[in-house]
Amino acid sequence: MDNATKFHHPYSPYDIQLDLMQCVYDTLANPVKKVAIVESPTGTGKTLSLICSTLTWLRDNKADILSSVDTLHSNEDDSHDSEPEWVKDTYKESILKDKLELLDEYEKYLEELHLKENKIIKFGTSIEDKSKVKRRKVTSSSKAKIEVSIEDEDEFVAKPYESDGEETTDLEKKEALSKEVQELLAKFDSSKKNTDNVELGRFASASQNQVRIFFSSRTHSQLNQFAEQLKLTNFPSSFPDKVAHERVKYMPLGSKKQLCINPDVKKWKTLEGINDACSEVRRSKEGCPFYQNTPKWHNSKETNHFRDQVFSDIHDIEDIAKVGESLAVCPYYAARDFIPSSEIVTLPYQYLLSESTRSQLRLDLKGSIVVIDEAHNLVDTINSIHSAEISLSELKQSYNSIILYMKKFKSRLNPGNRVNLLKLSKLITVLINFITTHYKKPGLEVDAFSILESNNTDMLNVHRVLKYIKTSHIAYKLDTYIQKLQEKESPSNQKPSSQPLLYKISKFLECLNNTSSEGSFFFERGPSLRYMLLEPSRIFQDIIDSARCVILAGGTMEPVSQLLQYLVPKLDDSSITKFSCNHVIPDSHLRTYIVNEPQFEFTFEKRNSVNLVQNHLFNFYLELSTTIPKTGGIIGFFPSYKYLDEIIVSWRKAGLFEKLDKERKVFYEMKDGPDPLPDYTSAVANSEGAILFAIVGGKLSEGINFGGNLCRAIVMTGLPYPNVFSGELIISRKHLEEKVLNGGGSKTDANMAAKEFFENICMKAVNQSVGRSIRSINDYSLIYLLDKRYANANIQSKLSQWVRSRIQSVSTVRDVMASSKEFFDQIADT
């Protein structure tokens, strides 16, 4: 069997794809390996290669996993421990035979579902058309209009709240039950079921998987793209002699905002509002018509049909929402139930990287394969999930909202609500006074206890206020009321908040309530008060300890040293696999130029030199505009919005901007301006000649691939070092230097570590920006690194391998332009 066939790739894979798949497979086969860092440039089929390698390994090894004594005896008692080995082996063979027969029966059933012309599920059917489902009739309130008007005051009034919220509701008690207790109740309940339901429930054990693949990515669209790639594949059965055809059991997990099918809940616009509304509906007397946290619901005919319909084919997140609608089954909770039955589960970063969310979802990573895509974002994402910030203006706005709300609904709020709203307003006042009194500059570190110590406020009060916010759902009621009030007063200008303020305050208070030595409170510009996690490795270590292997994949993973330092500082090198592949394009389709003339030095001290800006920089872009064919666009990246604005202003004053615009239409990204991409794309499509100035780390530097004619040349203007005077970087640097000194390092060592830290941030941004230029094997482009500091060997070592390997020997503007012209002449001749 050749390698291409071995991995069941749907196409004829490139050599680099075969190398990647073999590397991942070998890593999974080696129990010593815990982490793999895989770099595969944009356009090289990374996602499909990851699917083929991980799922091939799983199918190759599932038979051994299933036949293991531990697996077969997982639900048995210890009564067989004293039996002879031949008795145990016979028993084991009998159990395995029964499991495989049941699995074969289940696969045939799924095939019938897939082939039926009139499926049980008809996509696009509305909930209202399913009124015939007697066991889940939608209440009259669910048929009410979706939009909430300001006159619907009942929607905004907090339900009666007792004491300090220390009591536990029936709903919370039910949902706090352990998985084992839930399963015990389910078994007890199943004994009361009719034979039809028992028959349906038989397949639950047939589809159990001891090892799963968890695939996590940053955005909803990336996870949907994964589903589309998975549809292309076809894998053989793990048990070819016993089970002829084995479908891939794929379950996508999403938020309630994506999956909720209850009209009373869906009408709320924010994720936080939907979560609170869902909880309130479930705890109400009527409950939710689509979900009850009972063994009867979890083992019902409709819930089992949901599993089977989802597993009968590959469905993305929108598909399973429609499956839930058609069966009148909550797809959010049903999907969670069938994680153990899945081979592959996709989930957003938040679900994987938050320990509390994993616990809530009962995500068991033990022995499984975890694949994290776009992993260059991982450190920032972990820090962001576990950090919080609240500004002085937001605190004042929230305080005024609480006072307004209390005045409006004072007579309708019970004493428990009034008392706790007063406590909340007092706590906000404490934060307002602290910022007003103590703010001096960004980066000033703050002791968490000092925030509260001078105001007769303690952590117990913070805990009680948080309990109130969580159990009363006051946040979504108050914030939605204020938003509707603002819309009524100025409907044309009001934009809905992406995250209501009370939720932001709640997250900040949670950080204050659970202070950690691995994080720090400090001031930022605004002014604002911020908590930031400084040691993401502890959060990530829990995942590494549970999983069989964690694969960190991305198009641009350099500098890898930073990733290892922050995520796995204690992991031995022998436990880590590093893989970086070249690009699929021919070497002749990409060149990298380092423009190494002494005048091109965009340091903070020199970058605003009139001679540099109006002479050397302008002439470089003007000459480049005449060198690159008008059929192709030029992307010029700048370190910041502020610097690009200064360049544009300088060129306009000198009459240079119009000169460049005449040669090639100029578009540029503005911080608060309209998106220039559509007009730029149109100009390129019309072969008018166009140039687009964009910002490193801005809206156009990530997530958009400038393939084809959109990017025949990409220029990095300077090195995009971060703002070292931001509060975040001041605190990060201080923490890093203290860590080096506490570890026995010298002051020089600490300074070098800080220099390396800033350099790594810079080069990660460079790699992300230039990585947008190539999309497919037939693409071609030129990369210009416009700063003499790029000639530094340490800087070059942190470029992505496929960029670094194509650095040309020429370095003057004259020679670079001549080589560029030759490049396009050669392309035209091929």
Curated annotation (Swiss-Prot):
Disulfide bridges in this chain: none
UniProt entry tagged with the keyword Disulfide bond: no
A GO molecular-function descriptor: ATP hydrolysis activity
Renumbered ranges of motif DEAH box: 373-376
Cofactor binding description: Binds 1 [4Fe-4S] cluster.
Binding residues annotated for ATP, in chain numbering: S40, P41, T42, G43, T44, G45, K46, T47
Broad class of enzyme this protein falls into: isomerase
Key words of the record: ATP-binding, Cell cycle, DNA-binding, Helicase, Hydrolase, Iron, Iron-sulfur, Isomerase, Metal-binding, Nucleotide-binding, Nucleus
Residues binding [4Fe-4S] cluster, per UniProt: C260, C278, C288, C330
Entry's Gene Ontology cellular component terms: chromatin; nucleus
Subcellular location: Nucleus
GO BP, sorted A to Z: establishment of sister chromatid cohesion; interstrand cross-link repair; mitotic G1 DNA damage checkpoint signaling; mitotic sister chromatid cohesion
Cofactor annotation: [4Fe-4S] cluster
Gene3D superfamilies on file: P-loop containing nucleotide triphosphate hydrolases
Pfam families, sorted: DEAD_2, Helicase_C_2
UniProt EC number: 5.6.2.3
First-listed, main subcellular location of the protein, grouped into a coarse class: nucleus
Family: Belongs to the DEAD box helicase family. DEAH subfamily. DDX11/CHL1 sub-subfamily.
Function: ATP-dependent DNA helicase important for chromosome transmission and normal cell cycle progression in G(2)/M. May have a role in changing DNA topology to allow the loading of proteins involved in maintaining sister chromatid cohesion in the vicinity of the centromeres. Has a specific role in chromosome segregation during meiosis II.
Protein name, entry field: ATP-dependent DNA helicase CHL1
Gene source species: Candida glabrata (strain ATCC 2001 / BCRC 20586 / JCM 3761 / NBRC 0622 / NRRL Y-65 / CBS 138)
Lineage, opening ranks: Eukaryota, Fungi, Dikarya, Ascomycota, Saccharomycotina
